[in-house]
Amino acid sequence: MDTEGSSEQGKQTKEQVCSSLWPEGYPAAETVTSSVDMNTQPYRNLSGVRVGRPKLSLQGVQRGRPHSRRRHRTTFSPAQLEQLESAFGRNQYPDIWARESLAQDTGLSEARIQVWFQNRRAKQRKQERSLLQPLAHLSPATFSGFLPEPPSCPYSYPTPPPPMTCFPHPYNRALPSQPSTGSSFARPYQSEDWYPNLHPTPAGHLACPPPPPMLPLSLEPPKSWN
């Protein structure tokens, strides 16, 4: 009986101590944690404004941290790069069929090959711009030094040679008349018949005579020798 009375007195003293530490209107220490987690009813502060009770959750903490996205880089072997470069030299814009066949040859995926071709075209355009950029700053006077200089004097043409002086041909004399035997002999042409439209020549120069006329051939039948 004494032990039971002492235990009841001890409980009463503990309750008195707890009530002295915690003022009236506040829950006990055992119910504080549950009220923070479960009770979400708004309460009034000293100024009289209703403020919602904050919620604590792990999801909000995780959302505040930015997720670091890692980019997966593909490493190409020298043999794969050689095949890709040769295909790029043939066609810079391969279609789906060419990319799939190239994927089978290289062992890469079609998406990786498509990305490689896009990066390779961008690299080529960058190289072309870097080559053209120094030439854009040059003035036209700079290019004039590479052009050949014009000749100092105009082109000279050779003077035509003087006209040749023609002398009378020894056969220009009239041929002796030959006996005509009817229509068997043809009449020799005169010198006037050869050049009827010659222009007059200046003084001191004689016109070149025509070649000597051919003698007419005899139309008699050949004699037979017995």
Swiss-Prot record:
What tissues harbor this protein?
Exclusively expressed in the developing pituitary gland.
Pfam families with a match to the protein in the record: Homeodomain
Q: Which residues carry the record's DNA-binding region feature?
A: 69-128
Record keyword NAD present:
no
Which processes are annotated in GO (biological process)? pituitary gland development; regulation of transcription by RNA polymerase II
Q: Which InterPro entries match?
A: HD, Homeobox_CS, Homeodomain-like_sf, HTH_motif, PROP1
Compositionally biased tracts (Low complexity): 216-226
Do you know which Gene3D superfamilies this protein is assigned to? Homeodomain-like
| SMART domains on file | HOX
Q: Which UniProt keywords apply?
A: DNA-binding, Homeobox, Nucleus
Ranges of compositional bias, category Polar residues: 175-184
What segment(s) does the record annotate as region Disordered? 44-74, 172-226
Job of this protein:
Possibly involved in the ontogenesis of pituitary gonadotropes, as well as somatotropes, lactotropes and caudomedial thyrotropes.
The record's similarity note reads: Belongs to the paired homeobox family.
- The protein's name: Homeobox protein prophet of Pit-1
